[in-house]
Amino acid sequence: MAAIPEFAYGSSPPVPVAPQKPEQVTEGVTLLRPLSRRGHGPGMIILAPNDERAAPVEIQDGIPSLRMKWAEEGYCVAEIRPNASSGAVKAAMQALENCAECEPKDKMGLICYDTDLWSKSASAVESLKDRIVVAAIYAKASQLKQISSQTSVPTMYHLAGKSETKSTATANSKIYEYATTESSSFPVPFYEDFHYATEAVSHSRNLAFFKPRMNGPYFDLELLWDEHTYYEFENRNVEHTMATMVEEPYVNHVPTV
């Protein structure tokens, strides 16, 4: 590499992403701003199961929590837990609308990691389908018929186990079965049934499904990589190198967007 690449953001060397802590919106609803150097991104609502650890943290052994992982992807995240009230989806939407870092605000996504929460939230999601333009739901294969009848939002279904009949996708939906696992909590970090490789596959599928419908966020990954490798291997500036990386890289090189 002969010369410094174009700076990914601004006209100066990279600076670390400012630490962000989840902010409580109301009981059971938290807001986490984008953990990206860009600093803003579209809204993502997460329906998450309870964290049963005695001392919950956002990252453990290099594995981020659900909300942290999506914030590192550049989204502004509103997370809903089971102890939230019946108005949680609207409260989460309001928090995103009021957040300066949530931009644009007209196309938001939703991911459900807890089917009990989906049952409580489906009608609210449907009432906001002009704003919630895409969704993904993790469930058991046997639950597909029930949950798919509750929404008209374009949805990707991640199904644990093998269904007895062939699942058919539509113009507005995609269906993936994960026959090697029986638990729909396989994507939930810190759970006994968490399976890293399977979660990674489903996460990549979510990104491919969500980004065209939410108009991003898109990043110049080649430029980000060139900037990162320049500071590590040519400039050899530790501070600037670390500023191009996520908080706790889980492989040798994980540039932050």
Model-derived features: where do they sit?
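C-terminal and inter-domain tail/linker signature
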Residues: 2-24, 68, 75, 82-86, ...
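Short, surface-exposed "cap/lid" segments of acyl-processing enzymes
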Residues: 23-74
